[in-house]
From Swiss-Prot:
Compartmental location: Secreted
Name of the protein this chain belongs to: Ovomucoid
Record's keyword annotation contains Mitochondrion: no
Residues the record marks as site: Reactive bond 3: P16, E17
GO CC term (a single one): extracellular region
Membrane-spanning intervals of the chain: none
PROSITE patterns, A to Z: KAZAL_1, KAZAL_2
Notes concerning its domains: Avian ovomucoid consists of three homologous, tandem Kazal family inhibitory domains.
A family per Pfam: Kazal_1
InterPro entries (alphabetical): Bifunctional_prot_inhibitor, Kazal_dom, Kazal_dom_sf, Prot_inh_Kazal-m
């Protein structure tokens, strides 16, 4: 079970780096920052599916 530490998020601006993560919602997030922002917005219901594209 893969996890991502989102404790330092949300950040005001995400970098444009591309290191895709697949969320439990089957959506591909561009990077950890984008993913963690979505996790915060979901009140913790969103989890990491796996690293890489969905």
């Amino acid at each position: 079970f893969a996890t991502v530490d989102c404790s330092e998020y949300p950040k005001p601006v995400c970098s444009p780096e591309y290191m895709p993560l697949c969320g439990s919602d089957s959506k591909t997030y561009n990077n950890k920052c984008d993913f963690c922002s979505a996790v915060v917005e979901s009140n913790g219901t969103l989890t990491l599916g796996h690293f890489g594209k969905c």
